[in-house]
Amino acid sequence: MRIKQIPYNIDNISKEKADINLIFGEKSNGKSYQVKHKKAVLPYLELLDRLEKDKLVGDSYRNDERFILLRRWKEDISNLWVEQYFADVDVEKLTNGKYNCITVYRKVLYLSKYEVETGKTTRGDKIGYVMALSTEQHYSGGSYLDVKRIIFEEFMERGNYVKRCT
């Protein structure tokens, strides 16, 4: 008899309003899906929508709802991997057709529009950054004042425990 898997819902954790949320659990129950939607893409789009309604779009506003997608190893932040990570986000629906995918250029995440007819992608709004913990020295001294959240994905690895440094 197969046990029914309950899809993960981040709403109860969000209600706690904690500065740091550590989420771990069984594989394939929707943790990443919930986090990338509710803590990465949606907050940016909701703020943008509020700014447009208040006629504050343009250089007169600062969008601080951007995020950093953090992984342990630089191999985990290739453009292909990151774009595949966001492939299940229905960007077209969320942006009312303005964009249809999320792309990476120089480790910056963008809402983008892919044109099937031409095979070309046009970058739009910058929504975040992607970084690897193993290359943190490259980011020291950088300014990320527009970042509100850091999403550290897959922080627990099977078999590759980081040994204690002494």
Regions found by a protein language model. Name each.
Residues 1-166:
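Phosphate/NTP-binding elements of NTP-utilizing enzymes
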